[in-house]
Amino acid sequence: MNRYFVFSDVHGEYYALADALREAGYDPNNPKHVLVSLGDNFDRGTNSLDVYTLLAHNKQNICIKGNHETFLEEALEKGIDGEFVFFNILHNGLLETIQSFAYANMKKTISVAQIQAYINAINESWNQLLPWLKKMPLYFETKNYFFCHAGVNPNIYPTLPDEHFMLWDIEYSHVPIHSSNKTFVIGHHHAFRVKEKAEQAGYTTTKPKVHWVGNEDENGPVMIGNKIAIDPCSNLTHKVNVLVIDDEPLEEPPKETTEKPQDKVYISSNQDNKYTINVARSIDPNDITFEINRDLYNPNITFGAYVNHENIR
């Protein structure tokens, strides 16, 4: 039995995610605790790099692709010449993501050439980011749950729709999947919008039966039959909804190998009771050890990332 901590649409709000995971009882040292992101981890918020560092450090984490992951993927793969890259920079918060990963303080008036230079720098400094994005699954299942960014088509399930539907659909976000006994958990469409559409269509809405933390108002998770919508509207609420789900995996996960981490690259700071992760660009986030309350300098830091804490002086 694993305990899954499920969230969606963080959009660079790292501190909101960290607060919610702490409140939900997430322990990164517990092999039975698994993070499940339903996508849209990046854009709009200012701390996309920290969100990536948290998610990519542990191969046990489940990171489902959302439409905003495709925005970053296109930018890294095709550069500023990508079909929608410039549009997403101007209108969908991709500029803030590039700024976060490139350690740059950019303005809206930045030149195209400068943006391309920053994209090139990200590909060089974070060379595992693009492969990580490209390998993201469109969905994840446990014994009793199905997780996806935007959802599935209730009229054809268990046949799965195409990728565009699973990344973008809002038409069926409020419709239960009557052909399945599983519970379907989705993001993408703000939870309060899903609730409005469901009630207008005559469905009964409730709060999820599982434990959850996050928004206590209309932006909190909403349950319609066997579907739970959890998009927290994070950039406005500065909160992230986290469901805590105990369930059996579909298959036995692969055993982790223990490799000695690389030497010493660890800087953790606590400013105004905010906790941040700062990792040198040369370190692959997959090699980072991530623990709670193990900072040598300040025990009040909730999350700490380091490569080899014994070598810190």
Feature-to-residue mapping (PLM):
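N-terminal active-site segment of His-dependent metallophosphoesterases
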Residues: M1-T53, N58
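Acidic, His/Gly-enriched loop-helix segments that form or flank divalent-metal centers
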Residues: K107-A229, C233-H238
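Extended recognition/assembly regions associated with phosphoester-bond processing machinery
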Residues: M1-S8, A16, A20, N29, ...
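Short, glycine/acidic-enriched loop or turn micro-motifs at the edges of active sites
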Residues: H11-G12, D43, E69-T70, V152, ...
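Active-site neighborhood of divalent metal-dependent phosphoester bond hydrolases
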Residues: S48-P137
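Divalent metal-coordination and catalytic microenvironments
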Residues: D9, D40, G66-N67, T97, ...
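Residue-level marker for buried hydrophobic side chains located in beta-strands
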Residues: V6, L35-S37, C63-I64, F146, ...
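Long, low-complexity intrinsically disordered regions enriched in small/polar
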Residues: D263-N308
